């Protein structure tokens, strides 16, 4: 599919379908595209186009996920749908497809199932702020009392995981009937989009967040000082501003005396740019790859944190055997590896390839991280897992 010109006039929001296998996530994704295509707000996308999701790599991990685009009257959406349960877990933990909100699909014929719970928990852990519920297959489970009972169960479940279950919108629909063009059920897709427009918050743009650049390389320019290069992850940096150098060593401040991109001098660099930053009064020996430049006070170095991780299966290039408490791999944050030890939850003896679990990590050197920071777990240079920081401890 050719990328159309990106319409910047509407706010951009990333969403995704989550929920138990065969509850209708992919059918709903196809239905949204098909119904909105009638109004020219999406490209019509068939079920099999979404189901044959292409492979992509994120943090050394292969993930299958399908991406579609559509618009409502208010916003432009990028929507991700994953074919397999493991793909969802990998997607959420690696942040391969950022989700500003989710559409939770629950079948009215089955109610809440194990993956429903797991996806809600993961969404909570990785910081998805809100979700809208689509109660699917209401053309089959026509008994209104049954539908109400399922809706109540979903609300209770959302509340138990820290979401606002009481006020979360629940749309009663049939993805299949909407996909087939039945007007009664097509109307429910419009109801769903209105709920997504209203309930899922517009995310803060990356450029409006506090400045952060991950250092990839350092060099000395004779007579001018030290230059660090790297990609601006978020925010904006202007010449003359003071920044902090964070991670691996004690925090130190420095003033930016120049910014360069593609061999041109610039006044500023912003989110997404690869830039060289000239720092006054910093010796090259005092900065290194793996540190970050950041707006003062915006991020702290931490050695100990809690995380949600996914251990790669053997077929995915992961370990052939599980790992125990005290396992010491490398944790790759942004641009560098730091060794650390893993503590498993109380009743977990071992993490097997293909598992996802919560762990506590203690690194040998502090690294700039915060809730939501992503990392890879590596052993001898190969990726054996992926993780997302859920809480910083010290």
UniProtKB/Swiss-Prot annotation:
HAMAP family: EF_Tu_B (MF_00118_B). The gene is tuf. It catalyses: GTP + H2O = GDP + phosphate + H(+). Residues 174-176 are annotated as: G5. It comes from the Bacteria. Residues 81-84 are annotated as: G3. NCBIfam families: EF-Tu, PRK00049.1, PRK12735.1, PRK12736.1, small_GTP. This is Elongation factor Tu. Residues 19-26 are annotated as: G1. Residues 10-204 form the tr-type G domain. GO terms for cellular component: cytosol; external side of plasma membrane; membrane. It is found in: Cytoplasm. The lineage of its organism: Bacteria, Bacillati, Mycoplasmatota, Mycoplasmoidales, Mycoplasmoidaceae. Keywords: Cytoplasm, Elongation factor, GTP-binding, Hydrolase, Magnesium, Metal-binding, Nucleotide-binding, Protein biosynthesis. Monomer. Disulfide bonds: none annotated. InterPro entries: EF-Tu_GTP-bd, EF-Tu_GTPase, EFTu-like_2, EFTU_2, G_TR_CS, P-loop_NTPase, Small_GTP-bd, T_Tr_GTP-bd_dom. Mg(2+) binds at residue 26. It is an enzyme of class 3 (hydrolase). The keyword Hydrolase applies. Residues 60-64 are annotated as: G2.
């Amino acid at each position: 599919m050719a990328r159309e010109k990106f319409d910047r006039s509407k706010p951009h929001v990333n969403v995704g379908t989550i929920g138990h296998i065969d509850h209708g996530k992919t059918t709903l994704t196809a239905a949204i595209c098909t119904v909105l295509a009638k109004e020219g707000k999406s490209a019509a996308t068939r079920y099999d186009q979404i189901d044959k999701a292409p492979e992509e790599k994120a943090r050394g991990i292969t993930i299958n996920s399908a991406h579609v685009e559509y618009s409502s009257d208010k916003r432009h959406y990028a929507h991700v749908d994953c074919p397999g349960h493991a793909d969802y877990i990998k997607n959420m933990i690696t942040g391969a497809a950022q989700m500003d909100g989710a559409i939770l699909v629950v079948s009215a014929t089955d109610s809440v199932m194990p993956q429903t719970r797991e996806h809600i928990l993961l969404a909570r852990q990785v910081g998805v702020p809100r979700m809208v519920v689509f109660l699917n297959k209401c053309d089959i489970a026509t008994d209104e009392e049954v539908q109400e009972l399922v809706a109540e169960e979903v609300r209770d479940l959302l509340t138990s995981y820290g979401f606002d279950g009481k006020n979360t919108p629940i749309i009663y629909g049939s993805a299949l009937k909407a996909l087939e063009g039945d007007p009664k059920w097509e109307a429910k897709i419009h109801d769903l989009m209105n709920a997504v427009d209203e309930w899922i918050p517009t995310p803060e743009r990356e450029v409006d967040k506090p400045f952060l650049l991950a250092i990839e390389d350092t060099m000395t320019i004779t007579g001018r000082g030290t230059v660090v290069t790297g990609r601006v992850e978020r925010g904006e940096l202007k010449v003359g501003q003071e920044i902090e150098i964070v991670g691996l060593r004690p925090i130190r401040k420095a003033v930016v005396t120049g910014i360069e991109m593609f061999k041109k001098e610039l006044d500023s660099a912003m989110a997404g740019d690869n830039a060289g930053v000239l720092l006054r009064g910093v010796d090259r020996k005092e900065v290194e790859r793996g540190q970050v430049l950041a707006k003062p006070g915006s991020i702290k170095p931490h050695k100990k944190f809690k995380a949600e991780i996914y251990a790669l299966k053997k077929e995915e290039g992961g370990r052939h055997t599980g790992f125990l408490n005290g396992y010491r791999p490398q944790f790759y944050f942004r641009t560098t590896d730091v060794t650390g030890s893993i503590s498993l939850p109380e009743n977990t003896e071992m993490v097997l390839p293909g598992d996802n679990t919560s762990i506590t990590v203690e690194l040998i050197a502090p690294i700039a991280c915060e809730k939501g920071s992503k990392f890879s777990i590596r052993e001898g240079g190969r990726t054996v897992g992926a993780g997302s920081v859920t809480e910083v401890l010290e």
